[in-house]
Amino acid sequence: MSILWQSSLYAFGFYVALNALILLVLGVLVTRARVVTKTDIGDSGKPEMARPLRAHANNAEWTPMALLLMWTLATPIGTSIWLIHGIGVPLTLGRILHAIGLSSNAGPSALRFAGMVLTWIAYIVGIVGVFWLVFTPQSPAS
């Protein structure tokens, strides 16, 4: 059995690493666009900078809170590993789809839309899970 199915913390770490990799790739794409357009700070009014900047920024805006929700659920002993994967899979897939959709299309995009819906699903699962954890009577730790 894979270690990803043995521990909520290992599964959480896996999704942190995957989402850090996504952010790194998006950051490299911004740097590449800066080199190509000779842009130092911001977008310098160059429209070709808008999509890579927004793809990176959008990921940086949405991913941390979802990972924090996941961490809140991964740390208590006995939290279902399915809950961690129920947040991690849609979050990671959603962030990838959104970045591809935003990077490849200036206008509306089905991939971008699907990515946001999956990200919202991850948020909803995480929010409900944390509320359940907080408001459900737990047995005291021994």
Model-derived features: positions:
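Core segments of transmembrane alpha-helices
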Residues: 58-71, 123-124
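Short alpha-helical packing/oligomerization segments
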Residues: 72-93
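Alpha-helical transmembrane segments
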Residues: 8-25
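Interfacial loop-to-transmembrane junctions
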Residues: 97-124
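Juxtamembrane boundary at the C-terminal end of a transmembrane helix
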Residues: 128-142
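Short, strongly hydrophobic alpha-helical membrane anchors
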Residues: 1-7, 139-142
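Physicochemical signature of membrane-embedded alpha-helices that form the seven-helix bundle of GPCRs
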Residues: 15-18, 53-56, 83, 87-90, ...
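Cytosolic, membrane-interface loops and tails of multi-pass inner-membrane proteins
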Residues: 28-54
